[in-house]
Amino acid sequence: FRVLSLSTENKLPNVTGNEIGFEMTPVIDLGLALPCTPGGQMQGMVNIRITGRAAKKDAPDESLAVFSASYEALFLYPKEADEADVSARFERETHQYMLVAQAFPLASSHFRRELMAMGFNLGNLPLGL
C-alpha cells in the first residue's frame, strides 16, 4: 500500500468555532495485471482516489478547503497460481470486496490524519466500506 499523491489547500486561518460542512467522494478502481514475462506474478491492484471539500454551513457553494489524494494497493498472487483461476476469482464481487476491504481503511485513515493536521476533526469520516 502506498500514497501516490496528496494535495490540500486550506483558505481558513482558523477552523475553530466555525460551523463547517464537509463532502468526501471516493472513487475505487480494480485491475488485474497479467505477467508479460515467463515466471512473472499476477498482481491485483486497487486504486483509490479521494476528494474532499469543506465549506461553511451558511455558504455551501464557497469552498474553504479542498483535498485530494490517490492511493494504490498491490496484491501479488503466487507464481504458481493458475491464470484462469485467478481471473475467474477476480470477476467475483466477493473477491473484489476482499481486496478493497483491505485497502480502503488504510486510505481513509491516512486521509483523515491529513485533514486533522490541517485543523479539521472529522470523527464521522467513514473508515470502512
Q: Across the structure, where does each feature detected by a protein language model lie?
A:
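N-terminal intrinsically disordered, cationic/polar leader segments
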Residues: F1-Q102, S109, R113, A117-L129
